[in-house]
């Protein structure tokens, strides 16, 4: 049995709080990401991992030492580090002659690899190469995806879902306008993914809504997809299962549309409109001339009948 799989009994209150923090919960903790260097990572891959760690702070763990492992051949090392650091997301960087400037991005389910996708770095511009102001640590980004490949191809559809999981940050109920500080833009075109990062500038516009400008902040990457390791449909569905306690209770005759608008259905008996009392207005009263015409019409009808 692995040392991390043993049932541990806390000896101090601090250890008890630490173990309680890792226990299964209805509302899970914020997903942390671990960034790992391979045994032969070069300067480009190392800088990419540093920049990604800067975007993920404080929800990331950067391993500075090199780790000789191959995620697609042996996943035990990744699973060990996942348990040790309590991280469900990972990014692994390596470099060799066959696959230069290589990145593997993936996620865990129950401390086992759920899916991972290998990406090759064709072009890279670092955070420090772009001399502009940066966003503060822990800022929640806005994610934009452009390109039909993200909705057509299964590999790119999974990659989109994985990138959202990796960069979305904590779940919040609302965000103030000044809190929207930077954008991560992903474009899928001709089998490649273009990753860009922009800082959001709110300018005066003369009205209540400010004028928005984008300023490139970095990092910037041109990526090409290589190998994939995707979970089966059953396992993927199991990983997305929502506990019964968190599911909204069904209320009779009440439904919601895709935008969250609540609709209610009311069952009523058929109403007799003949007995409906309407508001009497002066403008609707008959005039004396009209009454005279009506009286003459009634008299003529009586004469004809006689």
Curated annotation (Swiss-Prot):
Which cellular component appears as one GO term in the record?
A: nucleoplasm
Q: Which InterPro entries match?
A: Brix, Rpf2
Can you give the residue ranges of the Brix domain? 31-234
- Specify where the region named Disordered lies, as residue ranges: 270-306
What's the superkingdom here?
Eukaryota
Basic residues bias: start-end ranges: 277-286
The record's subcellular location field reads: Nucleus, Nucleolus
Keywords (alphabetical) are:
Nucleus, Ribosome biogenesis
A biological process term (GO) from this entry: protein localization to nucleolus
Q: What is its main location?
A: nucleus
Q: Which GO terms describe its molecular function?
A: 5S rRNA binding; DNA-binding transcription factor activity, RNA polymerase II-specific
Q: What does this protein do?
A: Involved in ribosomal large subunit assembly. May regulate the localization of the 5S RNP/5S ribonucleoprotein particle to the nucleolus.
Quaternary structure, per UniProt, is: Component of a hexameric 5S RNP precursor complex, composed of 5S RNA, RRS1, RPF2/BXDC1, RPL5, RPL11 and HEATR3; this complex acts as a precursor for ribosome assembly.
Q: What family is reported?
A: Belongs to the RPF2 family.
Any idea what this protein is called?
Answer: Ribosome production factor 2 homolog
* Naturally occurring in which organism (per UniProt): Mus musculus
Name of encoding gene: Rpf2
């Amino acid at each position: 049995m692995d040392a991390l799989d043993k049932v541990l009994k806390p000896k101090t209150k601090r250890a008890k709080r630490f173990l309680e923090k890792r226990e299964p919960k209805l509302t899970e903790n914020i997903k942390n990401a671990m960034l790992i260097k391979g045994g032969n990572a070069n300067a480009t891959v190392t800088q990419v991992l540093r920049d990604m760690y800067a975007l993920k702070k404080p929800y990331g763990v950067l391993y500075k030492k090199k780790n000789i492992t191959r995620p697609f051949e042996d996943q035990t090392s990744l699973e060990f580090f996942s348990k040790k650091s309590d991280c469900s997301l990972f990014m692994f960087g390596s470099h060799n002659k066959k696959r230069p400037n290589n990145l593997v991005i993936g996620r865990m389910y129950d401390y086992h690899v759920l899916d991972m996708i290998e990406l090759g770095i064709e072009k890279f511009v670092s955070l420090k190469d772009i001399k502009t102001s940066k966003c503060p640590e822990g800022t929640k980004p806005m994610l934009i995806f452009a390109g039909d490949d993200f909705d057509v191809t299964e590999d790119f559809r999974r990659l989109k879902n994985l990138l959202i999981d990796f960069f979305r940050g904590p779940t919040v109920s609302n965000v103030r306008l000044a809190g929207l500080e930077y954008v991560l833009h992903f474009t899928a075109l001709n089998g490649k993914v273009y990753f860009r990062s922009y800082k959001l500038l709110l300018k005066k516009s003369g009205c209540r809504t400010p004028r928005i400008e984008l300023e490139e902040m970095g990092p910037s990457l041109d990526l090409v997809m290589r190998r994939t390791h995707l979970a089966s449909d059953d396992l993927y569905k199991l990983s997305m299962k929502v506990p019964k306690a968190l599911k909204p209770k069904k209320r009779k005759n009440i439904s919601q549309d895709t935008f969250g608008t609540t609709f209610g259905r009311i069952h009523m008996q058929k109403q007799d409109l003949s007995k409906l009392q309407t508001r009497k207005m002066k403008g609707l009263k008959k005039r004396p001339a009209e009454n005279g015409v009506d009286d003459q019409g009634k008299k003529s009808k009586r004469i004809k009948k006689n």
